Design a protein with these regions (language model features):
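Conserved beta-strand/loop scaffold segments within soluble protein domains that form the structured core
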Residues: 1-244, 258, 262-291, 295-296
Length: 296
């Protein structure tokens, strides 16, 4: 996709099937792709979207710049899934802007399984009685760099948001997370939570995290936090004492670390496929998505 996509779901329309868009980079020379996605979900509508980025010709430099805009009208439900499994020669800059109206529900899930250099930015404006979930999963190795930045603005009362981002970094990979929650003075009875958990699987991997919380109203429930650590040596010792090889024990612990993120996915096909891909990725095997319609 080199241009743009406009998806309009009319009032009251509830789509049962997932809309999937697959971008495959198959260039024989360095390339740049600029794309824009606009999603408008009407009142009391429902839509699920799955965007996938894949590379067919490895080693060809490519740059992707994309902007995604989501408008969720009153009572609408929008699920947006973004899966990136590209080559180390690929760089991607992605910005997502979402605006929710009263009583709407929005889920945004961004997964980076492989890339070169990726930066994802999320900006979400939350109205009254809305529910918002923002989830991110990153697995990076080599000299890959993955940054995620999120800003969730609660502008009205009785809204809920949850942010959860997890990273597994190995070799000399670099990760970054900058997450912000802002609760305005008129946003009483807001509940907003943010969590960033990171696992460094090598001595040279680095993670930079900066959770932020701004509250201008008293009657709220909010929390934020971040933690970065390494594999539990006691758990590794226990597993090895039970005859499990070290590499397999490490892979099992890392898979377990990501399992709750995968559990949040409400697309059964995508959830099963991600379990398969994460297992292959952490096992050092080539990613193979297979048939694209499997995830829907």
């Amino acid at each position: 996709m080199q241009d743009g996509v406009f998806i309009h779901v009319a009032d009251g329309v509830r789509l049962e099937k997932t809309i999937q868009i697959v971008n495959i980079f198959n260039a024989s020379a360095p390339m740049m792709a600029v794309r824009r996605v606009l999603v408008v979900a009407g009142r009391d509508s429902q839509v699920r979207l799955l965007f996938c980025d894949h590379t067919q010709n490895a080693g060809i430099d490519s740059l992707v710049s994309q902007v995604v805009e989501i408008s969720a009208a009153e009572g609408a439900t929008v699920d947006y899934y973004d899966l990136e499994a590209t080559d180390s020669a690929n760089s991607r800059l992605s910005q997502l802007y979402a605006r929710q109206q009263r009583g709407s529900r929005l889920t945004v899930n961004g997964t980076t399984l492989s890339c070169g250099h990726t930066r994802n930015e999320y900006v979400i404006a939350v109205a009254d009685r809305c529910d918002t979930e923002l989830v991110g999963m990153v697995i990076a190795d080599g000299d890959q760099v993955v940054d995620n930045a999120s800003s969730v603005f609660h502008n009205a009362d009785h809204s809920h948001s949850r942010q959860t981002f997890k990273y597994i970094l190995s070799d000399s990979a670099r990760g970054g997370f900058e997450g912000a929650i802002r609760v305005d003075a008129d946003a009483a009875f807001t509940e907003a939570y943010q969590t960033n958990r990171n696992l460094l699987a090598s001595e040279d991997a680095r993670m930079h995290t900066a959770p932020q919380l701004e509250i201008y109203c008293d009657e709220v429930k909010c929390s934020h936090g971040a933690a970065t650590g390494q594999l539990d040596q006691n758990a590794l010792f226990y597993m090895r004492s039970r005859g499990i090889p070290l590499d397999e024990a490490r892979r099992m612990l890392m898979e377990s670390f990501m399992s709750d993120i995968i559990d949040t996915i409400r697309l059964d096909g995508l959830q099963d496929r991600l379990r398969h891909l994460v297992e292959r990725r952490l096992g050092g095997r080539r990613l193979d998505c297979g048939e694209c319609n499997t995830c829907k």
